[in-house]
From Swiss-Prot:
One of its GO terms (molecular function) is ion channel inhibitor activity. This is Potassium channel toxin alpha-KTx 6.2. Blocks voltage-gated potassium channels Kv1.2/KCNA2 (IC(50)=0.12-0.8 nM), KCa3.1/KCNN4 (IC(50)=1-2.2 nM), Shaker B (IC(50)=2.39-80 nM), Kv1.1/KCNA1 (IC(50)=37-45 or no activity, depending on the study), Kv1.3/KCNA3 (IC(50)=150-180 or no activity, depending on the study). Gene3D superfamilies: Knottin, scorpion toxin-like. Has the structural arrangement of an alpha-helix connected to a beta-sheet by disulfide bonds (CSalpha/beta). Its main location: secreted. Disulfide bonds join C3-C24, C9-C29, C13-C19, C31-C34. The modification Cysteine amide is found at C34. Changing K23A: 1000-fold decrease in affinity for shaker B. The record marks K23 as: Basic residue of the functional dyad, critical for activity. Belongs to the short scorpion toxin superfamily. Potassium channel inhibitor family. Alpha-KTx 06 subfamily.
Length: 34
């Protein structure tokens, strides 16, 4: 998922992992587990 900031990643990562833990790194989302 492309992003401009970490908050762009929270919703897609919550869908993937069930948790909104995420960071935007090099304009793409990195999802972390709970």
């Amino acid at each position: 998922v492309s992003c401009t900031g970490s908050k762009d990643c929270y919703a897609p990562c919550r869908k993937q992992t069930g948790c909104p833990n995420a960071k935007c790194i090099n304009k793409s989302c990195k999802c972390y587990g709970c």
